[in-house]
Each structure stands twice: as structure tokens, then as C-alpha cells.
Amino acid sequence: MDLVALKFIAIGLSVLGILGAGLGVANIFSTMLSGLARNPESEGKMKIYVYVGAGMVEFTGLLAFVLAMLLMFVA
């Protein structure tokens, strides 16, 4: 197998990080909605932690995207 094929396989595998970020954010917000349905008074406390957690998960997805772009155009 030549190096170009291996490069595109690596790009495809790095896109799985973006998929994981999407699933992580969906899990965070579905858990938040489930918690708010059980205890609506906790919205103020829960909202801050949810946004921080979603930001961290999205950052990992952004890193996977940047890695894929670096592999595609630089390597």
C-alpha cells in the first residue's frame, strides 16, 4: 500500500473523533433534559456545568477536525 492511501485512511480514522464529539454532546444534553424533567428547580446550577462540558467535548471534535485538515493538506 502506498503512502497516499495510508494518508487517506488516517484522515478517515481521524474523522471518527468528530463523530464521537457529536455523540458526546447529544448525550450531555439528553441527560440534562432528563434531569430537568425530574427536577426543574435545578436548571440554574445544571446549565453552567452542561455548557462547560459541551464546550470540552466540542473542543475534542475541533481538534480531530484540525488534525484531519493537517493530514490532508500538510502531510
Curated annotation (Swiss-Prot):
Site keyed Reversibly protonated during proton transport: positions: E58
Gene Ontology MF terms: lipid binding; proton-transporting ATP synthase activity, rotational mechanism
PANTHER family: ATP SYNTHASE LIPID-BINDING PROTEIN, MITOCHONDRIAL (PTHR10031), ATPASE PROTEIN 9 (PTHR10031:SF0)
Gene3D superfamilies, per database record: F1F0 ATP synthase subunit C
Keyword Nucleotide-binding: no
Entry's transmembrane regions: 8-28, 54-74
Signal peptide residues on this chain, from the entry's feature table: none
Species of origin: Wolbachia sp. subsp. Brugia malayi (strain TRS)
Gene Ontology annotations for the cellular component aspect, listed alphabetically: plasma membrane; proton-transporting ATP synthase complex; proton-transporting two-sector ATPase complex, proton-transporting domain
Family in the record: Belongs to the ATPase C chain family.
Compartments, as annotated in UniProt: Cell membrane
InterPro entries, A to Z: ATP_synth_F0_csu, ATP_synth_F0_csu_DDCD_BS, ATP_synth_F0_csu_sf, ATPase_proteolipid_c-like_dom, F/V-ATP_Csub_sf
Function: F(1)F(0) ATP synthase produces ATP from ADP in the presence of a proton or sodium gradient. F-type ATPases consist of two structural domains, F(1) containing the extramembraneous catalytic core and F(0) containing the membrane proton channel, linked together by a central stalk and a peripheral stalk. During catalysis, ATP synthesis in the catalytic domain of F(1) is coupled via a rotary mechanism of the central stalk subunits to proton translocation. Key component of the F(0) channel; it plays a direct role in translocation across the membrane. A homomeric c-ring of between 10-14 subunits forms the central stalk rotor element with the F(1) delta and epsilon subunits.
Alphabetized UniProt keyword annotations: ATP synthesis, Cell membrane, CF(0), Hydrogen ion transport, Ion transport, Lipid-binding, Membrane, Transmembrane, Transmembrane helix, Transport
Cited PROSITE patterns: ATPASE_C
Assembly information from the UniProt record: F-type ATPases have 2 components, F(1) - the catalytic core - and F(0) - the membrane proton channel. F(1) has five subunits: alpha(3), beta(3), gamma(1), delta(1), epsilon(1). F(0) has three main subunits: a(1), b(2) and c(10-14). The alpha and beta chains form an alternating ring which encloses part of the gamma chain. F(1) is attached to F(0) by a central stalk formed by the gamma and epsilon chains, while a peripheral stalk is formed by the delta and b chains.
Protein name listed in UniProt: ATP synthase subunit c
Membrane topology, as annotated: Multi-pass membrane protein
